[in-house]
Regions:
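N-terminal Rossmann-like dinucleotide-binding module
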Residues: 1-53
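Residue-level signal for inorganic ion chemistry
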Residues: 10, 46, 94, 114, ...
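Active-site-proximal loop->helix
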Residues: 16-25, 44-45, 125-140, 156-159
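Rossmann-fold NAD(P)-binding glycine/threonine-rich loop
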Residues: 65, 101-113, 122-141
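Beta-loop-alpha module in the N-terminal Rossmann-like domain of NAD(P)-dependent dehydrogenases
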Residues: 78-110
Length: 201
């Protein structure tokens, strides 16, 4: 059985991971769940997955989270220091799904204490990529991208000789222009292009 930590369990990637783990309970043991502000979802996930440690990033919500989990035997903490402490708990797999720069420090710490760092936090590579990769090498931690586009590239290159790859062309999924007629694409403005239906561009 593999021990797992999920950072950002109430976000998009974290929620998908939780769904998968609920169907694989015999293969995985969730040790750590962390969320940002969504205490109801975090409490629900905790009751289903029964992690040892639960962390809410927003320390002001710690009391409310504890109230939702009265009667359950969890180590419940809150705030940045609690997140960083949770990242230092040794696990087989650490999923880093915290959004934005807030996830960088957790990724750097988790790289020291996990066998596999499943990275959805792009900022960790953009802001600290050289350091993160060095920490992974020093600790024999596998760095696996799990965010959509990065994971697709990783999967395509798996088993290939990277030295033979001259360039990678990554096509878009459509964004705001998925159903736009070809003739109408000629008049698209930058403002329209940044109006993605799901993500703030």
């Amino acid at each position: 059985m593999k021990n797992i930590s999920i950072f950002g369990s109430t976000g998009s990637i974290g929620s998908n991971a939780v769904e998968i783990l609920l169907n694989q309970k015999n293969d995985f043991n969730v040790l750590v769940l962390t969320g940002g502000k969504n205490i109801k979802e975090l409490a629900k996930q905790a009751i289903l997955l029964k992690p040892k440690h639960i962390v809410i990033a927003d320390h002001e919500l710690l009391g409310d989270l504890k109230e939702l989990l009265i009667g359950h035997d969890f180590d419940i903490t809150g705030g940045k220091e609690a997140l960083l402490n949770a990242a230092s708990i040794p696990v087989d797999v650490s999923l880093q799904g915290i959004i934005g720069f807030a996830g960088v420090e957790c990724s750097l710490i988790a790289a020291k204490y996990s066998k596999i760092l499943a990275l959805a936090n792009k900022e960790s590579l953009v802001c600290a990529g050289l350091l993160l990769k060095q920490i992974c090498r020093d600790n024999n931690t596998a760095l696996i991208p799990v965010d959509s586009e990065h994971s697709a590239i990783f999967q395509c290159l798996n088993g290939e000789n990277i030295k033979t790859v001259e360039r990678i062309i990554l096509t878009g999924s459509g964004g705001p222009f998925l159903n736009t007629k070809l003739k109408d694409l000629l008049t698209i403005t930058p403002n329209q292009a940044s109006n993605h239906p799901k993500w703030n561009m």
